[in-house]
């Protein structure tokens, strides 16, 4: 008998995702955050289940790794909170203040 060919090849779902580093600029309800990526785009990020179950706190000004789908680049899943260095964190907090000022001036 002839064997059936597997028409649907199994692909790794991680191949459809791209990982970026970003800075949390705003905390929203239900574990959602606005994250500014390295290329200065701002996307909506949500906490992954592993971070949620580990009770890891993510605050404004934290640097995070975020996994973004190739199909919808406006949303991403926060998969890791990067350890912060005091000097870098201070620079980032100044960046956040500048970003807020520029957003306020637009309104």
UniProtKB/Swiss-Prot annotation:
Membrane recorded as keyword: no
GO cellular component: chloroplast; cytosol
Record region (Disordered): 87-107
Cellular compartments annotated: Plastid, Chloroplast
Keyword Phosphoprotein: no
PROSITE patterns cross-referenced by the UniProt entry: S1_IF1_TYPE (PS50832)
SUPFAM superfamilies, alphabetized: Nucleic acid-binding proteins (SSF50249)
Major subcellular site: plastid
GO molecular function: ribosome binding; rRNA binding; translation initiation factor activity
Ranges for domain S1-like: 8-83
Pfam families, per database record: eIF-1a (PF01176)
Domain of life of the source: Eukaryota
Keywords linked to the UniProt accession: Chloroplast, Initiation factor, Plastid, Protein biosynthesis, RNA-binding, rRNA-binding
Subunit structure as annotated in this protein's UniProt entry: Component of the 30S ribosomal translation pre-initiation complex which assembles on the 30S ribosome in the order IF-2 and IF-3, IF-1 and N-formylmethionyl-tRNA(fMet); mRNA recruitment can occur at any time during PIC assembly.
Function of the molecule: One of the essential components for the initiation of protein synthesis. Stabilizes the binding of IF-2 and IF-3 on the 30S subunit to which N-formylmethionyl-tRNA(fMet) subsequently binds. Helps modulate mRNA selection, yielding the 30S pre-initiation complex (PIC). Upon addition of the 50S ribosomal subunit IF-1, IF-2 and IF-3 are released leaving the mature 70S translation initiation complex.
Family: Belongs to the IF-1 family.
PANTHER family for this protein: TRANSLATION INITIATION FACTOR IF-1, CHLOROPLASTIC
Protein name: Translation initiation factor IF-1, chloroplastic
Originating species: Agrostis stolonifera
């Amino acid at each position: 008998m002839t064997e059936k060919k597997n028409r649907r090849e199994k692909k790794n779902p991680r191949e459809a995702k791209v990982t970026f580093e970003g800075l949390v600029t705003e905390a929203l309800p239900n574990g959602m955050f606005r994250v500014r990526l390295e290329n200065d785009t701002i996307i909506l990020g949500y906490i992954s289940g592993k971070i949620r179950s580990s009770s890891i706190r993510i605050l404004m000004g934290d640097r995070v790794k975020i996994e973004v789908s190739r199909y919808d680049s406006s949303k991403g899943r926060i998969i890791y909170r990067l350890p912060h260095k005091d000097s870098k964190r201070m620079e980032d907090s100044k960046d956040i203040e500048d970003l807020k000022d520029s957003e306020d001036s637009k309104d």
